[in-house]
Amino acid sequence: MVAADFLQDPRVQGWLDGVEPAWTLLTFESLLALRHDPPAVQSAIQITNDLSVGEIAGSPVARNTLILLRQAIERVGLPLTATGNLSRATVAEMCKLIEWPDYDQADAFRLNKVINEPDFLPLHVVRQLAQAATLVRVQRGKLVATPLGKSILSDAKRGSLLAVLFHLAFWRMDLSYFGRGLLGSWPQADAGVVLWSLSVCANDWQCAEKLTRLCTIPEPAMFSETWDRTAYAMEAKISDRCSGSDYLSTAAKNLRAAGSASIIFIARRSCSIDCSPLTSR
């Protein structure tokens, strides 16, 4: 059992409320393996980089990243504001092109007199991911496609797009933005452990609170909060980023709050967990 002494802490026991986390089934060595960056040699988490054109098209985040790239190429750059966001005119055009599951633009914009890039969250996230992946860059007041971004449009390179975006989303980007700063970046530092735990315990419906306790490793800072916000942090930073993956689909549906939109929607075959090097008690 992993971290037996840690689990005896009265605060941890009170938070768990009788739930035994899935990750306690792992040996310490296996737990460490899941905390490795996926590109590491013999990583326990394998990210598929040879998806078909159809599979890529089935992923909203990949599909809309390609739309952003094509627009940047066709328009010879997308105008930016002084703050670095896409111009309102560009955002208005992108609103017509970008579609997202369970995302109602009319509802999302009902209180906005004008629509800026951060107001249209699917576009904002796709732009941030594309820029982090160096598919686009800022040049002379415009967002332009890089040589890498142009090359990813080819059928030969497109199959690796989702692997790049998935890796960046969980292991490079700061997802605390989606949790409105609550609990910092937790539980993103243990993304691999959380994904493995979801894959083994999310076969049946679970409430958000229980699934959070099954899949995450608590931290001391959590217990200083007046209210328990761990389920919200888990939903905002992990489950909504996974919605649409084959082995995580149940977990994502269980955790998603009514009316919320999944921002990272991955193809069904984009990520898998290789359990062969993992051992459990």
Q: Model features per residue range: what roles?
A:
Residues 32-75, 156-211, 279-281:
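Leucine-rich, amphipathic alpha-helical/linker segments
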Residues 2-125:
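Short, amphipathic alpha-helical interface elements at domain boundaries
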Residues 184-281:
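Elongated scaffolding segments in large macromolecular assemblies
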Residues 77-78, 136, 207, 248:
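Intrinsically disordered or highly flexible coil/loop and linker segments, enriched in small
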Residues 117-133, 139, 226-246:
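Short amphipathic alpha-helical interaction segments
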Residues 113, 181, 226:
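Active-site-adjacent structural elements in folded domains
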Residues 124-126, 133, 137-176, 249-281:
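Accessory beta->alpha helical hairpin/"wing" motif in late/C-terminal subdomains of nucleic-acid enzymes
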